[in-house]
């Protein structure tokens, strides 16, 4: 262990205290815009993650519908269309679910935790509909179900609420908690657009963009869930 000059935050590195850095394997479920971004970010931040945690994070497998499709910046050998291949791999300790929707995401998350794997999800719909039973499964299997990326545009708010402010009594939470809400309020405040007129404009905008009804409903209800569910704010 080496202590460097005063003021250097990385002078003493956890990895050095723990000995040789261990490798942690993860699997990504989904390789769309979010999934590809997670993979690339994990690579860019590899050294920082190692310095701060003493562990090397490696994406071992990526679950997709079409493994033969070329995706820029991601090695082809990582892709698989077999969930069982990921589930039954003892080296994979973390499953990162970024595929969206309810099914098969719900089944995969449940099975991963029952197999003892830790889960990270950015799936608002899934948590809004099945948050309680999923957290029960996580508790029963002594697994983590991390969901910060699914709340308020990934603003780091859940961990401070559950840990840093665990001894404080929360009486109120105020804020603009998603991009859709922020966009609507900006139209109303800066352009003076009334809500009725705005609603008609939004409806036409959705039709022009051919946004699926399911996605539009999720965008509109995003501000109501899952941040506001009481069980998600109880200190650990």
Each language-model region and where it sits:
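Short acidic, glycine/serine/threonine-rich loops at helix termini
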Residues: 39-40, 72-74, 131-134, 156-163, ...
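Active-site-lining helix/loop region of Rossmann-like oxidoreductase modules
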Residues: 167-236
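Conserved active-site and cofactor/substrate-binding residues in soluble primary-metabolism enzymes
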Residues: 29, 33, 37, 57, ...
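Rossmann-fold NAD(P)-binding glycine/threonine-rich loop
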Residues: 105-111, 124-162
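A short hydrophobic/small-residue beta-strand
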Residues: 119-120
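N-terminal glycine-/serine-/threonine-rich beta1-alpha1-beta2 phosphate-ribose binding loop
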Residues: 5, 15-114
């Amino acid at each position: 262990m080496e202590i460097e000059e005063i003021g250097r935050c990385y002078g003493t590195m956890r990895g050095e205290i723990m000995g040789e850095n261990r490798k942690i394997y993860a699997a990504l479920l989904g390789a769309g815009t979010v999934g590809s971004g997670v993979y690339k970010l994990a690579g860019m931040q590899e050294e920082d993650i190692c310095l701060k945690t003493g562990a090397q994070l490696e994406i071992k497998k990526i679950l997709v519908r079409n493994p033969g499709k070329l995706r820029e910046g991601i090695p082809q050998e990582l892709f698989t269309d077999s969930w069982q291949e990921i589930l039954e791999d003892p080296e994979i300790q973390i499953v990162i679910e970024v595929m969206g929707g309810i099914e098969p995401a719900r089944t995969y998350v449940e099975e991963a935790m029952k197999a003892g794997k830790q889960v990270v999800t950015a799936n608002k719909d899934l948590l809004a509909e099945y948050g309680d039973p999923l957290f029960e499964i996580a508790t029963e299997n002594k697994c983590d179900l991390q969901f910060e990326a699914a709340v308020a545009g990934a603003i780091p708010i859940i961990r401070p609420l559950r840990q840093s402010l665990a001894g404080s009594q929360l009486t109120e939470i105020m804020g603009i908690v998603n991009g859709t809400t922020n966009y609507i309020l900006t139209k109303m405040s800066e352009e003076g657009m009334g809500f009725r007129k705005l609603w008609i404009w939004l409806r036409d905008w959705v039709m022009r963009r051919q946004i699926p009804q399911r996605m539009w409903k999720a965008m509109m209800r995003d501000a109501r869930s899952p941040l506001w569910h009481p069980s998600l704010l109880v200190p650990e």
